[in-house]
């Protein structure tokens, strides 16, 4: 697997992530179970985005010093494009979490605890998936066509799909978990497990955590191949992906109260997936530069938010009228 990642870059990335996670876990432990306010969520979102951009700037500077701008510029652009793709696709993941918490009636104060462990699990699972994907691509380059076709199909499916939280409890996976886990009927404070009559029982909070992890894996199956369309370098794919998901918890609390205001977002994300799928399928006939890919993804997101704002304005006007 060819990569620009050196021991210094890998080590620096690991240290930054470890420090930020330690700070996050320390704050979680000191404050206990409580809901993150909109102000706190906005502040933490800004912290994570700023940290990601600073890392990319340091990454670019390091490559300029060691490899020159001919290498540094496209690699930094690849990181930024991958980060933007993952960050935008992660919004759909956030909406699924919102449905899970709503269906299982998880109090806002406990949602943060679930997401702390959910993000930690996502880091481990995505790291495994990214290195596996990088190895597969290095051995079988034709697998990019499979990724492209899958993203094209997923984009069309996303545009046509309709999510309904009322059917979550009837999903085969949920029924299987409930049937095979010794589980209590109600949430017991912030505990994932409790002891009753000498036996260990999982609480519904543990079920929600499992579903949060599985939902992230499902979305990673979309988002990771999407970043491979930009670059196959495992260092850039992993760092851009993890920096994007590290801010997911703050993004959730930022968007949780206004989720219904983003009705058009899934269509924009669907267009992004279709574009990336086509990019992967035509790679042998026409190479779309990274800068163009970044511009297209950014442009689609901007247009989506403009259309969404217009739709909300029309709905609000009709409601008042």
Swiss-Prot record:
Periplasmic side: 1-6, 65-89, 135, 220-225, 283-286
InterPro entries: Integral_membrane_TerC, Integral_membrane_TerC_rswitch
Topology term for the membrane: Multi-pass membrane protein
Coiled-coil regions listed: none
Top-rank taxon: Bacteria
Residues passing through the membrane, by range: 7-27, 44-64, 90-110, 114-134, 136-156, 199-219, 226-246, 262-282, 287-307
GO CC, alphabetical: plasma membrane
Family: Belongs to the TerC family.
Protein name from the UniProt record: Putative membrane-bound redox modulator Alx
């Amino acid at each position: 697997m060819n990569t620009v990642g050196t021991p210094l870059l890998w080590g620096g990335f690991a240290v930054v992530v470890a420090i930020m996670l330690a700070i996050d876990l320390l704050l979680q432990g000191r404050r206990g179970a409580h809901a993150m306010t909109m102000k706190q969520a906005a502040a933490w979102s800004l912290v994570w985005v700023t940290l990601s951009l600073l890392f990319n700037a340091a990454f670019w500077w390091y490559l300029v010093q060691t490899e020159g701008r001919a290498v540094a510029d496209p690699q930094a652009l690849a990181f930024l494009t991958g980060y933007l793709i993952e960050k935008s696709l992660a919004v759909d993941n956030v909406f699924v979490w919102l449905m899970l918490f709503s269906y299982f009636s998880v109090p806002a104060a406990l949602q943060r605890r679930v997401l702390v462990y959910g993000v930690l699990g996502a880091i481990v699972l995505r790291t495994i998936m990214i290195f596996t994907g990088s190895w597969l691509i290095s051995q079988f380059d034709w697998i990019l066509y499979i990724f492209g076709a899958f993203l094209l199909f997923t984009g069309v499916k996303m545009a046509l799909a309709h999510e309904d939280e009322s059917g979550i409890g009837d999903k085969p996976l949920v029924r299987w978990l409930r049937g095979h886990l010794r589980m209590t009927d109600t949430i017991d404070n912030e505990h994932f497990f409790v002891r009753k009559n000498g036996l260990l029982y999982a609480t519904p909070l543990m079920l929600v955590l499992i579903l949060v992890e599985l939902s992230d894996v499902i979305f990673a199956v979309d988002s990771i191949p999407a970043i491979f369309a930009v670059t196959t370098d495992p260092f850039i794919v992993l760092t851009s992906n993890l920096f994007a998901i590290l801010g997911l918890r703050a993004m959730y609390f930022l968007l949780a109260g206004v989720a219904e205001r983003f009705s058009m977002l899934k269509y924009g994300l669907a267009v992004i997936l279709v574009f990336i799928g086509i990019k992967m399928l035509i790679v042998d006939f026409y190479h779309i530069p990274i800068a163009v890919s970044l511009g297209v993804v950014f442009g689609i997101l901007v247009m989506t938010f403009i259309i969404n704002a217009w739709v909300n304005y029309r709905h609000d006007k009709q409601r008042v009228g």
